[in-house]
Amino acid sequence: HPGALPVLNKRAVELALQLGLALGADYDRYATSGGLHIKFDRKNYFYPDLPKGYQITQFDEPIVPGGAVEFPFEGGTKRVGITRAHLEGDAGKLTHPEGKDYSLVDLNRAETPLLEIVSEPDMRSPQEAKAYAQELHNLARYSGASDANLYYGNMRFDVNVSVRPVGQKEFGTRTETKNLNSFKAVEKAAEYEIRRQIVLVEHGDQVKQETRGWNEAKQQTYAMRSKEDADEYRYFPEPDLPPLVITPTMVAQAKAEVGLLPNDLRAETSSAKLPAAEAEVLISDPASALIWHKTVTIDQRQARFALGWLVGDKVRLAQDTGLPVESSSVTPAVLAEVGLMVAGGSLSSTNAKALLEHFYAPNVKGSPAEAAKAKSLLQESNEDELAVVVDNVINAHAQAAADYQAGNQ
């Protein structure tokens, strides 16, 4: 509306703090001065996806003042520093129809809150960049900051690439390839830019500092516009948004919302001596990873059984039914009980899959032991032995049994 002024989105600030904590930002060091002081600025440039001619962003006092991300890579651990992360209003979306002499502008996402993470130049290969992007995707979801759905553009990646001759200390001129929406695109765009820039340097040509796009069909980057330096954006404080102090209370509230993070789960799966590759598949799905963690909290002995089902049969069931595991009746208590029945010999591995498939639906009543008996899934045994098995399973999970009897799933 004409004359409308911007208003800071409180929820965006809260979610940015949650992700900032997951990125390793040290907010505690600002506590003695009352908290972290942040402000907003105008970034001035002309482009069709920015109708106002400027973007509200943060220049020198961002909401995430730094941090670092550590993740497994090629048998070791890779560390990438976080320069900063700042809140800003998103720009529109440009699309370039193949073979046409025009572009289309979609402004539906314009001015929606965006947190831009700026990384240190710590990556040395396209594969490292891809692994780092995957870990950022994990952290965005585990922190509760975003569902980070790549298909819908809820998380996008800009890849900065420069090359330099062996032995040269200074970085070369960089390009920025914008708005990549898949991990594969991150890797392929970086590979293409490296090849392109090496050819230029080896032929004595200069690499232009520019913003580039990614053509998925051709698997090539293409020039979009020259890349400005910071002073060319003519930053100045946003007059319509007052500065803000991120107080220790706000930080404490954000910490309460951030639960387990990927490296916490890596430590747990490593302690349980689980295969690293399968553990990474589990960790890539926060809902499944949380179920695994809670299952192991109930019964540590079920770590391997729970992992096997969550990265195996569960994936098939989720695809077949369209039901996410967290919406099914396969709770940690159910998974632990089924695992105990398998370990105790009363249930075969094949029948355990059938039993868990029975529970892979909303609001399934009864305990696994009761369902197994009703469906004749238990190993053949006389009635006395069967009663002992059922009693042992129920006694081992007395609280879970009480919850079922009370009607709680």
What kind of feature is each model-predicted range?
Residues 326-336, 346-409:
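Strongly charged, low-complexity linkers/loops
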Residues 98-103, 321, 396-399:
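Short amphipathic beta-strand starts and helix->beta connectors
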Residues 11-15, 128-131, 185-189, 260, ...:
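Generic recognition of stable, solvent-exposed alpha-helical segments in well-folded globular domains
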Residues 195, 311-319, 340, 357-361, ...:
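Amphipathic alpha-helical core segments of compact helical bundles
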Residues 256-273, 283-288, 329-334, 346-347, ...:
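Short acidic alpha-helix initiation/capping motifs at coil-to-helix transition points
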Residues 153-165, 270-293, 301-321, 333-335, ...:
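Core structural elements
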Residues 1-260, 266, 270, 276, ...:
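Basic, nucleic-acid-interacting segments
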Residues 29-33, 203-210, 268-272, 278-283, ...:
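Short coil/turn segments at secondary-structure boundaries
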